[in-house]
């Protein structure tokens, strides 16, 4: 007796050997993952766990992090350079740390320190107030006395050669000198204010505000022409001179600013809000090469700069890039084009800007600026911003900080539920990976390594592994629904994984069937000594229409390929 020959159900194999990172969108390609932890693109095209992190320092009250040939951080009210405490005393609270030449500048404290000479530090602002007699006299711009002169609306009757006369006939006083035949205007006439200690801490060229002078015309904003400890020279000519005992104050002030950046040997800043009872919506620049002076206006190309803006809303971030400076609001950017002649230009561009609270997310990666906006992460190369965060799905992030490292955009942010995420975007391949929920408040790149400072005070080497390296790394990768990519009925009969775990590293494979929440363990591998070829893990799920695969483990591991073998089912519903 003969039985009919049975025909095996046709099978189809799909193999993935290029893993596409995190993609939360429905119907994402096989090889991408709906969720993951502690993976990165360093092993692409394979799926690889991130390198172990090292804790290089522990802070008590972290407030800021930057690199100046070595890591620099703020802990409480102290500034540390490469672990050494400096003598600079700061206030409590978050800081903006901006580099300019050898100097590190700290906002909102308006303090500075020379990182090549840690004994040179202080305040960028300065103020003196007299306590004794103040003498006002006319002088040359260098401070040389002019001598005696007559004052009046008519010239002296019998002047001698070299006699001086202050002509007050036309309202504005003019000092003239008699050359033997006619009266000629004397140029370079200034006013000197002399009192003990009035000029201490100032330099020629400083833009200062003088207050309290009884002499008309001396109060106001001036650029100092010459300075000594006991006198200052300002470029005005007063009608009357003399002395007073009332206090005179001289102040070199810096405007309050929301964000500060350095570009072209200047500092640039912005401010939106109420200052001294007046609404302010302005962009500022320091004097060229001088971070202390923001009010030096002498008609030179090196002058300070200030400009009001018409766009509404608070400033949300700033970045120096593409040869200029960009100040962001949520719905626009103010692009500053610096000029060597001092004729700086600002253009308002209506486009997605930096989300409020995400000013620290603006970071350059290989010449492209990335930042977190209201609707995702954007890349700006000089034309218009483009959203690159579609694979992250509908999740919106806030309280974001970021840095660029090795062609990658590292982002630490918080979702609407308050959960923290460390996400890494490989800009060359367009791949996202999620690492963990470390509460990182600042990044910096130093010595080729990327550092992150957590709100708990841990200074982490995220890539180099220096310091106290963590013993093991727990990781996880979870696929979307497998088996929904074709309209006909198919059944996933076998999964095959080519993996290479390190010695004593563990990998487990679990599946969830038909959209369920229960996870069933199907296989496990533990790395062995001397294993170089890797392992092949065979998984045989029960018959189902669709399933999700979750890989999880401890220790470093690399997944080279994933194969899914499907068996064709009936054509019925």
Task: Report residues per predicted region.
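Beta-sheet repeat architectures centered on beta-propellers
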Residues: 2-69, 353-357, 364-368, 375, ...
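Small/polar beta-strand repeat architecture
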Residues: 5-9, 124-126, 130, 171-172, ...
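Beta-propeller and closely related beta-pinwheel folds
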Residues: 51-58, 253-404, 433-434
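Blade-loop segments of beta-propeller domains
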Residues: 61-62, 68, 76, 81-101
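Short hydrophobic/aromatic-rich beta-strand motifs
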Residues: 70-73, 102-106, 156-176, 205-210, ...
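Short, surface-exposed terminal/edge motifs of secreted or surface/virion proteins that either
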Residues: 78-81, 110-126, 163-188, 223, ...
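Short loop/turn segments that connect beta-strands within beta-propeller blades
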Residues: 83, 179-181, 338-341, 382-383, ...
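Extracellular/surface-exposed low-complexity repeats and stalk/linker segments enriched in Gly/Pro
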Residues: 85-93, 134-164, 185-194, 397-400
